[in-house]
Regions:
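Rhodanese-like catalytic fold shared by cysteine-dependent sulfurtransferases
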Residues: 1-50, 58-91, 100-138
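Conserved beta/loop motifs at nucleotide-recognition and modification sites
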Residues: 53
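Short, surface-exposed ligand- or partner-binding patches at beta-edge/loop junctions that are enriched
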Residues: 94-95
């Protein structure tokens, strides 16, 4: 008991660090949708040929996007779900700029029985940070 009192700050830091390290795994497990790093995304793209779904706004998409990405802004996704029907049992790599909109999009797609969803961890920002190519709309 004396040890705990004297080292409460260190114990708190250790517990906090452990939670911070485990959070991505816990978060991934809760959604059931795997987060893939930019490097893993490139491997997925070369092996499984997924639909790359960009759910960012039009201006963001035009400023730069992954080659071959299908653009459906998150705000339009529910109304445009029919465009994606043929991908229900095929790999789909969903991304936005940082990851929050993609997470919402994955939840919407999962509710429509899409079975092979992947989310680009860190979004296009992480893709660009990894020095991977983007293309701009003409």
């Amino acid at each position: 008991l004396e040890f705990i009192k004297e080292n409460a700050l260190l114990i708190g830091l250790a517990v906090g660090s452990g939670i911070a390290l485990l959070w991505p795994m816990l978060n991934r497990g809760a959604s059931g949708i795997p987060n893939v790093s930019p490097t893993e995304a490139v491997m997925l793209m070369s092996r499984a040929k997924p639909l790359v779904l960009d759910v960012r706004d039009a201006a963001e998409f035009e400023a730069g996007h992954i080659q071959g990405a299908k653009h459906i802004p998150l705000a339009e996704l529910s109304n445009r779900m029919k465009e994606l029907e043929k991908y229900k049992d095929k790999p789909v790599l969903v991304h936005c700029q940082k990851g929050m909109r993609a997470k919402t999009a994955c939840s919407l797609l999962r509710a429509q029985q899409f079975t092979k969803l992947h989310q680009l961890q860190g979004g296009l920002a992480a893709w660009q940070e990894a020095k991977l190519p983007i293309v701009k709309s003409a």
